Amino acid sequence: MNPSTHVSSNGPTTPPHGPHTTFLPPTSPAPSTSSVAAATLCSPQRQAVSRYSGWSTEYTQWHSDLTTELLWHAHPRQVPMDEALAAAAAASYQVNPQHPANRYRHYEFQTLSLGTSEVDELLNCCAEETTCGGTQSTVLTNATNTTSCGGAVAGSSNVGPAGASAACDLDAELAGLETSAADFEQLRRLCAPLAIDTRCNLCAIISICLKQDCDQSWLLEYSLLCFKCSYAPRAALSTLIIMSEFTHLLQQHFSDLRIDDLFRHHVLTVFDFHLHFFINRCFEKQVGDAVDNENVTLNHLAVVRAMVMGEDTVPYNKPRRHPQQKQKNNPYHVEVPQELIDNFLEHSSPSRDRFVQLLFYMWAGTGVMSTTPLTELTHTKFARLDALSTASEREDARMMIEEEEDEEGGEKGGDDPGRHNGGGTSGGFSESTLKKNVGPIYLCPVPAFFTKNQTSTVCLLCELMACSYYDNVVLRELYRRVVSYCQNNVKMVDRIQLVLADLLRECTSPLGAAHEDVARCGLEAPTSPGGDSDYHGLSGVDGALARPDPVFCHVLRQAGVTGIYKHFFCDPQCAGNIRVTNEAVLFGRLHPHHVQEVKLAICHDNYYISRLPRRVWLCITLFKAFQITKRTYKGKVHLADFMRDFTQLLESCDIKLVDPTYVIDKYV
């Protein structure tokens, strides 16, 4: 028996150490609402028998209020400008739209929601930075511009009176600087969890819950969520599902806990979930040296923070190699808990749940779905986001009035951090404009939206891997058909184009020119031709049952040939997701009579190991950061050092990709 857990036939009798019990340093500051949460957890609501199997559309629905609120918190924001600054920026845009200070505004004019007035578009876009060091909604290229980050627009020129006037427009420059300062302050508060010496707020909440979890039922379900997280792709949809299901578990077992207040007070942010479930993996059993593990987390947090803040350089430090490390076995070889996985698969069946509707809802009206109108879904989402913004502004106003009344009554704010953060439920965030045309980009492992050469930092095929068991099987069949299309030495891009044409012809009911109905489809994965819902048969070698449905074909059209090529053969982030994703575990629905048994086995084994070590994910994140950061002399030196080590790392992990030195400058 694992010494860190004590499990009897009736369930775990003591909270296990390691992945579930958090030992907090006495000097760490407590979250501002932790004492309130502890007080309200005194009467947990218990369920007789829970059938929670994880990763289910029952808990994460696209039309739920919780989903919209989580998406609202994951959108980047921009401080609105006053009329004088907006007029100065507008004048600069009219004089020379091709000036680097205005080329990002030009893109956002094309991608803003339908029905938005020209003035609103200007207010949403006029404060973009002139370089890639600005806010993270900045898009690198538009439909006619594929220049690299920080470069001039193709075909543009600042020669002549118009160019000189735009280059010397001090009002526009001051407008950008003042707005950037406010944006920077918001981003700084948002990135508070991305510090190595800041306590994990999720661990603090889990510690409070464990004290109130008398029969350990919540612990078993949380363990199952962690187990499934180890076999999920790192994508925006995965982060949203984890946030939603974690919130659902808290609300189900502790009905008095107002989890929504934790988000509104910014005690919890989207980056708390990135840190806990993906970057540091607080539930994972510690392997190796503790200080080395801490440094991996430190470096990963620094890279993510740099991307969110839009810094011009990548915080890369060449790792030091000790002589004794060269004689060790491959440090990137991971032993998966095969016995535990076999036990899970024996007592589960693939679910027909599908998150495609949620995927469309997330990215409707954004650059990710640039060729897909989805007008009805876009209007629905934007209206809900606007309603949340209005409610947040009203709550902020109410809180400010209460604070003023308290101060007039002699109650001073003291060292209350909420007052210094702008007060109110949103920490001053509601005073800014939600960048709805960018989408919930903070959910992504690369929290910045860029496009380049018909690719973007949001890979739709990686998102599709988090949608359903069926989509993973069809993606695997697509890859098999591409690599085995013919015996001739045909380039992969040509193979993809030919296979894609065949797939679209084979589609059971092809979509027409209108794409509106696609958002209403895909709630469940299609059944086999005989009506059988057992999806183990989909993985047959002939692929007869793994036929794409119209929704799958629609996503392939949106990704395009280049996006498919990048996903299968070029991008290390996509390769990592393909390596770690196990759709049979992720979408496995436990049989009713074995739910408790399997949960006890997962909690007892205490084994939550990903197939790729955290150091590999750190290097993958560094690669993505170098892709979207402009090239300086110092950056080029760092990039050359990094690429040498990164190529060796891919070989050690047996990951075969197109030359990374080509990919890093070609795609994003």
From Swiss-Prot:
UniProt subcellular location: Host cytoplasm; Host nucleus
Cross-referenced InterPro entries: Herpes_env (IPR002597)
Entry keyword set: Host cytoplasm, Host nucleus, Metal-binding, Zinc, Zinc-finger
Entry's Gene Ontology molecular function annotations: zinc ion binding
Chain positions covered by the region annotation Zinc finger 2: 459-574
Region (Disordered): 1-35, 401-430
Entry-linked PROSITE patterns: HERPESVIRUS_UL32 (PS51988)
Gene Ontology CC terms, in alphabetical order: host cell cytoplasm; host cell nucleus; viral envelope
Residue span of region Zinc finger 1: 200-282
Binding site for Zn(2+) 1: C200, C203, H276, C282
UniProt biased composition (Low complexity): 19-35
Annotated Pfam families: Herpes_env (PF01673)
Sequence ranges of Polar residues compositional bias: 1-10
Ranges of biased composition (kind: Basic and acidic residues): 410-419
Binding-site residues for Zn(2+) 2, renumbered to this chain: C459, C462, H567, C574
Role played: Plays a role in efficient localization of neo-synthesized capsids to nuclear replication compartments, thereby controlling cleavage and packaging of virus genomic DNA.
Family, per entry: Belongs to the herpesviridae UL32 protein family.
Protein name (record): Packaging protein UL32 homolog
